[in-house]
């Protein structure tokens, strides 16, 4: 149980740390976003207020604002010639500088500014570095040390086929080659002339007959013969021994009932006393 509590606490601490880091990253990103939007808006207002361009000192002394933007529009519409807001001439030389204005009152010293935040990513700097008022262009630094050798690149495509070179000098006589394959058989030659007549051969007479040899092995059985005719009936055989008694048969059906018999003869006296007479008449 205690281990589970420690694990839960450790997990919660990790989650809180991640949330805190996420909030810090979000604040940094929002600061960069506000700085970029503020700078972009400043450039848009400056470009609209001073279409012909202006130096940075004028922008710093009289920074354009949202009210200046709409005030300039009204002045252009009301007094286009006095404010010199009409179409700008092209190719005209600059006029003489005007008289210096009255000296203004000295402003109060400003408070020390807060420490600056980290700069914008390099991609944003690369996009806005040509706009006036952007980052300071620093001279390139010294070249860094030589880096390590890169990996071997993939093999290049196959080159064009080279030209045929000049024929080489004639070589010396080579050694004997290996034995070739056997040739095809030649054509049959002509028949030769008949040979000389041979000497007469020895004549032999037939000898006496030899003894009979042992009998040969038994041959295979012959084919089956045709079926024979029906034989004659044989004599009657003797009477066989009596068989074993069979099982008792099923009881037969009951016969018809006989006729009633007549009255039997009186039996002998058993020695009993005579029966008493009846006391009433039927």
Curated annotation (Swiss-Prot):
Entry keyword annotation includes S-adenosyl-L-methionine: no
Source organism: Caenorhabditis elegans
Family: Belongs to the cuticular collagen family.
InterPro entries (UniProt xref): Col_cuticle_N (IPR002486)
Keyword line: Collagen, Cuticle, Disulfide bond, Repeat, Signal
Signal peptide: 1-24
Keyword Repeat attached: yes
A Pfam family this chain is assigned to: Col_cuticle_N
Gene Ontology cellular-component terms listed: collagen trimer
Region Triple-helical region, residue ranges: 95-124, 141-269
Region feature (Disordered): 86-282
UniProt feature, compositional bias: Gly residues: 170-180, 225-234
Residue ranges, compositional bias (Low complexity): 235-244
Protein name per UniProt: Cuticle collagen 8
Function in brief: Nematode cuticles are composed largely of collagen-like proteins. The cuticle functions both as an exoskeleton and as a barrier to protect the worm from its environment.
An example molecular function term from Gene Ontology annotations: structural constituent of cuticle
Subunit and partners: Collagen polypeptide chains are complexed within the cuticle by disulfide bonds and other types of covalent cross-links.
Compositional bias of kind Pro residues: 214-224
